[in-house]
C-alpha cells in the first residue's frame, strides 16, 4: 500500500470573536505552522439580525443596513488585528468577511477559497447552546467539502503561555 499524503496548506478558521474563537484561532495557527500553510480567518455577520435593522430603518430611525454592516466589519477587523493577528507566530493570515446565514457562508467560503481544512468551535456567542453557532457547526460538518476540525471551549484546551 502506498503512502497517502494530504495537503493542508489552506486552513480556514471560523471566528465570531467569542471565547471559543481564541482556541479555534490557536489551533488553526498550530496546524498551519506544522504544515507550512496559511490561515484564512472567516467572520460572518448573521443576516438574521439584519432584519431588525432594516425594520428600524424603514420606520424612520435613520439606520441604514449597509452602513451598519460596514461599521460591524470595521469593528471586527480592528479586534482581529489587535487580539488575534499579533499571536500568529509568523503564519501568514488573511481575514475575510461574509454576510448571510453563517453555515451557508462558511460552506461558500470553503469552496471559493479552496480550503483544505476548516477549524471551528462547537459553540459561539451567547448561551443559546445549539441555537446559533452550535447548529452552524452541525450543518458545516454535514455539508463541508473539506475535513472539519471541531474545537472545544477554552476550558478544554491547553494554550501556550
Task: Describe the role of every protein-language-model region.
Residues 42, 94-98, 149:
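General small-molecule cofactor/ligand-binding pocket signal
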Residues 61-78:
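A short acidic, glycine-rich active-site loop
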Residues 1-6, 34, 85-118, 155-161:
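Structural beta-alpha unit
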Residues 146-154:
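Short, flexible loop segments at boundaries between secondary-structure elements
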Amino acid at each position: 500500500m502506498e503512502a497517502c499524503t494530504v495537503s493542508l496548506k489552506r486552513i480556514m478558521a471560523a471566528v465570531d470573536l467569542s471565547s471559543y474563537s481564541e482556541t479555534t484561532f490557536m489551533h488553526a495557527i498550530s496546524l498551519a505552522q506544522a504544515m507550512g500553510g496559511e490561515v484564512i480567518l472567516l467572520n460572518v455577520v448573521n443576516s438574521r439580525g439584519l432584519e431588525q435593522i432594516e425594520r428600524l430603518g424603514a420606520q424612520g430611525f435613520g439606520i441604514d443596513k449597509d452602513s451598519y454592516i460596514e461599521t460591524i466589519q470595521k469593528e471586527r477587523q480592528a479586534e482581529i488585528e489587535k487580539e488575534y493577528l499579533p499571536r500568529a507566530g509568523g503564519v501568514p493570515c488573511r481575514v475575510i468577511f461574509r454576510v448571510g446565514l453563517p453555515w451557508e457562508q462558511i460552506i461558500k467560503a470553503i469552496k471559493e477559497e479552496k480550503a483544505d481544512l476548516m477549524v471551528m468551535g462547537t459553540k459561539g456567542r451567547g448561551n443559546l447552546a445549539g441555537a446559533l453557532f452550535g447548529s452552524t457547526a452541525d450543518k458545516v460538518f454535514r455539508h463541508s467539502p473539506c475535513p472539519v476540525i471541531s474545537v472545544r471551549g477554552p476550558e478544554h484546551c491547553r494554550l501556550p503561555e
